[in-house]
Every structure is written in structure tokens, then in C-alpha cells.
């Protein structure tokens, strides 16, 4: 038996698939691909699958992964990739299968790219509203937690935010805490921009990578 890490992208309309539905989709694809999987024991056996870090609904992912256990060690990573790629939709392309080098529990940071297109007005006007938000002494936001709603200041987490302006859009790149210890969604920033500055825009959001506490790329 061996564990392999399947790397895939979650693009286009797939960003609106919940994590539960993604799990079911992946399980069906694995079954169709006839990969010799290891199943859990008990009354309801299931294929062993461990996703690195679920994506929020509405967000795309450039470098997502799921760990699976394979019964036959003779099957190669390349063969797993080819079989699974044939069984998944075009919006969930598999681009690599590797041996896991880092446990998902080590994930501590994530990088994101947001593209904001104003519904009305110009990108320059939207940039002015973003700058006004960032100039506030605090950016108060509310976040759902296991114990209820938490109220906190988002501004200390935006120190690595970079903004580039195009003719018709803004592109935001940012690093935020992610993982089991602390998870700050980039949607908190866009929600604050809309609520506190009255900005109206379309947002395309992509999680580009995951990292450990030392900022080493999750592999």
C-alpha cells in the first residue's frame, strides 16, 4: 500500500461546487478510473481521501490536492494521473501525482489573487475606495467561528497586500493565515470594501498556493 498526492485545479464553474460535492465528485471519478484504492473498514467502506485545505465556496484553486491510498504499489503516479484525468470534468484538471512531502496539518499560510472589476465607475475610482479602506485606523470585520461570530480588526493581516491597477480592473495579491490554527478569508476584505466604502464590483478569486509556517510551499 502507498499514499499518493493528486494535484488538481478547481476552475470556472467548479468554484461553485461545495467541498462535500467535490468529495463525492472525486470519489466517483476514482471509482470510474479503476484505480486500486484502499477503503476504510467497517459497515460503510469509503475510499481514503484527505484534501489539503477545503476552498471557500466561490473561490478557484490553482494548486489543490487530495491524498489517496493505493493497494497496488505497482501502479505508477503517471498512470494514476492519466486514469483520473480522463474521469474528471475539464474544470477539475489533474496536473500531477506525487509522493506527499508535507502533512496537511503543517499548512499555515495561503496566497490569493483577487481580480476586482467595478460594476459602475472606473478602476481608478475603485482603487480610491480601496485606498480609503486601507487608510482607516482599523478595518472591523465579523467572522464565523465554531463558537459563534467573532469581531476583529482585519488591518494587521494586510501587511503583504499588493495592488496593481489595469484599465478596467484591480488585481490584489495577498498572503493570509490559513489552516487549522487560524484561517483568514480574503473575502473578508472584499466584504469590507463593499460594506464600508460602498464599492460595487465583480470579484474573481483564486487561491494560488499553500505554505507551512516557514513559508515553504506545500508539497
Map each language-model feature to its residues.
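Ordered, amphipathic secondary-structure segments that act as subunit-interaction surfaces
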Residues: 62-113
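Extended, positively charged loop/linker patches that create polyanion-binding surfaces
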Residues: 101, 107-150
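Short amphipathic alpha-helices in soluble, non-transmembrane regions
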Residues: 78-88, 125-134, 188-190
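Short glycine-/aliphatic-rich beta-strand segments at the starts of folded cytosolic domains
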Residues: 4-9, 33, 66-68, 108-116
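N-terminal ordered "arm"
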Residues: 13-39
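Core RNA-modification/binding signature centered on pseudouridine synthases
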Residues: 135-219
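Helix N-cap motif at beta-to-alpha junctions
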Residues: 71-76, 119-121, 179
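Short, charge-patterned binding micro-sites
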Residues: 38-68, 101-104
